[in-house]
Amino acid sequence: WVRTPLLPTNLGARRTNLTLRDAQSINTRWSPLLGYFPNSPWGTLSITNNYSKSLERREATGTTSRSLSLTMPDLILSMNQLERIFGTYRWMSSASLNSKYSLRKRLNYEVDESRDINLGGDLHFVIKQVYDMTLSYDESKGTTKNFVTRLTTRQDKRQSGSAGMGFNWRIWRVNTKFDFSQSRGYDALGRISQDSKVMSPSIGLRGDFNLPAGLRLPFSGKRLTFTNRVILSSSLKLDRQSSQLNVEQTNTDNWNWNLNGDFQIGQNLRASLGSSFQLFKNRVLKDQDYYIYGLNTQVIFQF
């Protein structure tokens, strides 16, 4: 048993540190409407809950401490076939919704207590069997209270969301996305300790196609066939950051572009070529602007 007392042979030995940790976790999944509506979209409703608890006791050089971590509830609700519920099945398909809520507590006995609440969800659907759409949103709030000073030493809030669309255009797969996040935090005196806002639009392209060709060998009736498979991918992204703190360093625009190509000429010969370009601009201090570019290539022979 792991908690069997240590029995040192040295009579002068003393225990210097000790850590005891007890952890419990329970995971459950429930489909409350499946038995009542087996062939209905309501029957796809599922509820998942995770429960976890951890109690830790420490002793170091005669100083003892205890801490408790508790996550309850940690709920996830999901449902599919939403187009049948809203009657939008003529132009919408594969609609699914996931929503979540969690509460996490951490207690350091006689020291402080922290609470973090998180809620959010994501929605996915396809329009006209062409446009693959994804929407998501998350929000979290956190507080920390000190039992000694009886002050709230931490208050913060974070919000984030994204919207993405993907579709096929001829031989290309096009993916567009827009990410947004902002956070704000305050210390025990009510001063702003954290402030950040980031917007990130991006677009990506990927193509996979073949350009078959052949070469007739001289003095022979045989023909050497080349696969000529080409995979091209490229992306462009902007990270625009804004903040009221450390204004000279936190108000920036960061552009990133890359282009990669993979060429499979035959079964035994493949080549790849890549390029990248980064442009960094500081909207306050112009002398900190810079750019970076790179090129790489690789040829692979297989025998």
For the regions a protein language model found, what residue spans apply to each?
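Exposed, low-structure sequence patches enriched in small/polar residues
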Residues: W1-F303
